[in-house]
Design a protein with these regions (language model features):
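C-terminal amphipathic helix plus adjacent low-complexity
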Residues: 8-11, 21-23, 29-36, 49, ...
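Acidic donor-binding loop of glycosyltransferase active sites
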Residues: 63-76
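Conserved catalytic-core segment of nucleotide-activated headgroup transferases in glycan assembly
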Residues: 1-56, 63
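Short acidic active-site motifs
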Residues: 58-59, 81
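Catalytic binding pocket for nucleotide-activated donors in carbohydrate/polymer assembly enzymes
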Residues: 73-158
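Beta-sheet entry/capping signal
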Residues: 16-19, 47-49, 68-69, 91-92, ...
Length: 179
């Protein structure tokens, strides 16, 4: 599962920590459950940080300034959280799957020109994250490049997005009616 993959990454990057933002973060039950889950993989509780709901959008987005890499969940990808990470310049590593729920990260990263951040397997997911964590020069470069890539992409250009969607729908209609 995802805890195992995140633990492998934490074990491979000494001194690293994982920030998990969740509505139930203040719950002692959630804390105990996560501590036990990560402990099974040799991760001390002080390496897994929990953050709860931030009442202000600015405070929520400011948390992205405290992380170097966003590790997408699997099989359910982040959508809004992935967009927020990219908006804040945080590179996202994702693991692609076969269904919509596990292809959102692929779509977002491909549309900003970063398909190399998409893993096809659990092993590749870990390798991408560890390699990136050990490359501070690339991390710094991505921190400034990613917001510009996002702003210039089709994701932030509704007119261009709509034209491409219209073209795709027209093509699908033509294929369907030509049978």
């Amino acid at each position: 599962g995802i805890v195992r993959r995140w633990s492998v990454i934490l074990n491979a990057v000494p001194g690293s920590r994982l920030l998990i933002k969740a509505g139930g973060a203040a719950s002692q039950c959630v804390r105990a459950h996560l501590d036990a889950a990560f402990a099974q993989h040799g991760i001390a509780a002080n390496r897994v940080l929990l953050a709860g709901h931030a009442p202000k959008t600015e405070d929520h987005l400011d948390l992205y300034n405290t992380v170097d890499i966003a590790l997408d969940t699997f099989p359910y990808h982040g959508a809004t959280t992935t967009c927020e990470a990219l908006w804040m310049g945080v590179p996202v590593v994702t693991r692609v799957g076969d269904s919509h729920r596990s292809r959102v990260g692929l779509s977002l990263l491909t549309n900003i020109g970063l398909p190399g951040m998409v893993a096809e397997s659990d092993e590749q997911y870990v390798q991408l994250a560890v390699r990136l964590a050990n490359d501070p020069v690339r991390l710094k470069r991505l921190r400034t490049e990613i917001p510009a890539r996002l702003r210039q992409s089709i994701l932030c250009d509704p007119a261009r997005f709509t034209r491409q969607l219209e073209d795709a729908l027209t093509q699908a209609w033509q294929v369907r009616t030509s049978r």
